[in-house]
């Protein structure tokens, strides 16, 4: 059964397992890095699907994990709009829990962003400004998901939330992760939800909105390249 189709990859259900199968053109190093990220986050004790195997299926690389039976938080939010605030509360609580973890072997967020900014088509002056701002931001070592949005949370039948898709995970500043989530809502034309999210995140983490805002151009630039 096909669970999801994304660019360059398909996720299949196979009994109690989920297989994420990558196209032949997908870099092997990226696939192995994703598996390694997931294994490292697994060790924090967070609720995530466990990696069972990295293998090849019909000549294509695949990551095999435990299958989580349930609905994504995005689906639940669409089905029960009256519960939006309750779901958003849960969403931010899960993010705060992730950010409270440490995984010292994960790649560093700032290094990844610096590399991404250097790969953009932005002119040298803009790149310099962004890199200077990035260098001036405080160094933290929080576990950052990197693509934290409601479609990457599965709520199982018992109501337990699981976080999936750790391909972008790094260790770094939680406000950069929040800025990324805010931008994902905006890109999805959910402006009202984006504002609600930002207020809730800042309240729950006692973070100044201006501080998260300082990350927005850096995050936007680093996300503009794959």
Question: What label would you give each PLM region?
Answer:
Residues 100-146, 154-157, 162:
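An alpha-helical support segment within catalytic cores of ATP-dependent transferases
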Residues 4-32, 39:
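ATP-binding glycine-rich loop module of kinase domains
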């Amino acid at each position: 059964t096909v669970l999801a189709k994304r660019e360059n990859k398909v996720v299949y259900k196979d009994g109690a397992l989920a297989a994420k199968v990558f196209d032949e053109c997908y870099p092997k190093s990226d696939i192995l890095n994703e598996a390694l990220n997931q294994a490292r986050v697994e060790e924090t004790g967070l609720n995530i699907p466990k990696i069972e195997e990295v293998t090849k299926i019909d000549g294509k690389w695949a990551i095999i994990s435990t299958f989580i039976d349930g609905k994504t938080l995005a689906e639940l939010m669409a089905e029960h709009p009256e519960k939006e605030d309750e779901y958003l509360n849960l969403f931010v609580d899960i993010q705060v829990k992730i950010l409270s973890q440490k995984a010292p072997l994960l790649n560093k967020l700032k290094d990844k962003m610096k590399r991404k900014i250097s790969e953009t088509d932005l002119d040298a002056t803009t790149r310099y400004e962004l890199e200077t701002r990035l260098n001036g931001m405080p160094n933290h070592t929080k576990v950052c998901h990197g693509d934290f949005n409601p479609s990457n949370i599965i709520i199982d039948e018992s109501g337990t939330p699981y976080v999936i898709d750790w391909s972008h995970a790094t260790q770094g500043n939680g406000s950069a992760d929040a800025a990324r989530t805010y931008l994902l809502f905006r890109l999805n034309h959910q402006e009202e939800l984006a504002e609600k999210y930002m207020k809730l995140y800042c309240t729950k983490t006692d973070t100044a909105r201006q501080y998260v805002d300082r990350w927005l151009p850096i995050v936007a630039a680093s996300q503009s390249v794959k």
